[in-house]
Amino acid sequence: MELRSRRSAEAYLVTPEEPAKNKSERSIESNERVGTREAKSENTSVFSPAYSDTATTDSSKKVDDNEYYNFTSHFMPSLKNTRELENTILNLIQRIKEGDDETLVSEKDLILSVLNRSLASTSHWKLQAQLSELRATSEGRYAVETNLLKKEVEFLKNKTPKTNESASSAELRPLLERPLKRKLSLPGLAQRPLSTGARLEGGYGGVSPNSWKTKVPKLPLPASRPSLNLSPQKVPTGTDKVEEDTKIDTLELVENNKPHPRMRRRSDNPATNEYVRVFHLEKKEPKSRKK
């Protein structure tokens, strides 16, 4: 389980790939990949930082190699290239151990290319380690911020729960009691008779036909509104009424046909013009009595 968790964590580390391999490296890897795995001695132990933190023996390494190769072949190519580079280095070490001094000269180009790829792979995974550290710090900071927010919300919720509940209950009690009091204060209306025959017989259920009218509450009469006249009103007497009648008889309403500043003339037809009609009171001319 630890091996799979470590590989799944490494699968997220992705950066530009390492340089391409030479033809000689490809031929060596294709021909000697299987042979070198079986030709290793039982006493030697191999340290593989790509997938293990401790040295492993050949008995347990065969299973891990097959599992890890199948895993990396379907995932990120950077892991696959790193694993292939590891196999190439192991093959090259084995060939140098078994060979003579001439092998160093013959395999000079291969050694240089492997060293170059090793440097690229080292820089690649060093960058990935730095990125993982930064990601871990950012995730830890985010977790701390979320925990602080949760604690703050819980503190605000549990700050004064008792006082809030008592105040809310005290406010709700009168609101719940008011409609009940109103219902009890209203007079109960008797049921109306179902037919005219029941009315003639004395009412339905022993109730007189006009008893429900007496129990209906009467609405208050609308209050009389004061007049809009600003002048103080006087109680009219008999002499005042006679004087007002004489004044009304001596005055008449006459329309003023002079042009007015508020008049609007839109056409020659006076019926369509929108204007303000001005009237004034004039004294009536005394009619000449016929002799």
Curated annotation (Swiss-Prot):
Region (Disordered): 1-62, 220-242, 255-291
GO CC annotations on file: cytoplasm; nucleus
Comp. bias (Basic and acidic residues): 18-41
Keyword Cytoplasm: yes
Primary location class: cytoplasm
Keyword annotations from UniProtKB, A to Z: Cytoplasm, Nucleus, Phosphoprotein
Modified residues (Phosphoserine): S267
Miscellaneous comment text of the record: Present with 450 molecules/cell in log phase SD medium.
Name recorded for this polypeptide: Uncharacterized protein YDL129W
Source organism (scientific name): Saccharomyces cerevisiae (strain ATCC 204508 / S288c) (Baker's yeast)
Species classification: Eukaryota, Fungi, Dikarya, Ascomycota, Saccharomycotina
